[in-house]
């Protein structure tokens, strides 16, 4: 838990490695994920590692697995330096733990994305899945949340699960594009948030790919300037603002 003289690097082959203090894995060298889970301890337990951003040192091979847990329900861990340069093609990202993991990462090399617990957020827009391949599966479990905020959000993936997916923020407008090659088996809550400041140039487009369906969850719209095109939906709609 305590910062130490260990400088790195680190190879995680299996099990769970829990860090409880800033600097616990040193400040140099790659942190290589060959399996297992990296967990941030609950900050309420004593030492606090939530400000310990090791993302620029993460190394995941092609087809690898990046499993991250933030254990504290009120904790937020921000990884600003995660990039395609350190994420192998076809990486599977899994988020567990009751806290929030905030990523500054476009996400376009992900094969699969799973939010089992807590919240996973992508800051400054995101592209998840590569169009037209559309082989990516995004699953958000019941009680968990995926937040995609700011700029352009492209979700070229099959969306599954019963959790909450929030796209946009109250003070920004952007483009939301949801497309996949098959039906979206999502029974949770899809929240579309934005203000459409200039509808002529910054309208919040929500494009469901032609021939695709959105499952029987709830679509909550809180904002203005949203336009729907193509596709079908079996979802219930709630309008929070006009």
Label the predicted regions.
Residues 1-62, 76, 80-88, 100-162, ...:
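Surface-exposed loop/turn positions within long extracellular repeat scaffolds
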Residues 66-68:
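Polar, low-complexity export/assembly segments characteristic of proteins
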Residues 92:
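Active-site and glycan-interaction determinants of carbohydrate-active enzymes
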């Amino acid at each position: 838990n305590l910062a130490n003289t260990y400088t790195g690097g680190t190879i995680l082959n299996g099990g769970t490695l829990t860090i409880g203090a800033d600097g616990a894995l040193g400040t140099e060298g790659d942190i290589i994920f060959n399996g297992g889970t990296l967990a941030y301890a609950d900050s309420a337990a004593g030492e606090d590692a939530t400000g310990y951003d090791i993302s620029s040192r993460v190394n995941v091979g092609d087809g690898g697995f990046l499993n991250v847990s933030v254990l504290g329900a009120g904790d937020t861990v921000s990884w600003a330096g995660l990039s395609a340069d350190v994420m192998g093609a076809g990486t599977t990202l899994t988020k567990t733990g009751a806290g929030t993991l905030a990523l500054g990462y476009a996400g376009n090399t992900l094969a699969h994305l799973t939010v089992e617990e807590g919240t996973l957020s992508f800051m400054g827009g995101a592209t998840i899945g590569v169009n037209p391949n559309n082989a990516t599966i995004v699953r958000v479990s019941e009680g968990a949340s995926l937040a995609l905020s700011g700029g352009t959000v492209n979700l070229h993936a099959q969306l599954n699960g019963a959790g909450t997916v929030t796209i946009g923020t109250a003070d920004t407008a952007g483009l939301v594009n949801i497309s996949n090659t098959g039906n979206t088996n999502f029974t949770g809550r899809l929240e579309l948030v934005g203000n459409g400041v200039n509808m002529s140039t910054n309208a919040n487009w929500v494009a469901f790919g032609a021939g695709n369906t959105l499952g029987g969850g709830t679509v909550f719209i809180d904002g203005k300037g949203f336009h729907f095109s193509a596709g079908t939906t079996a979802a219930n709609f709630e309008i929070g603002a006009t």
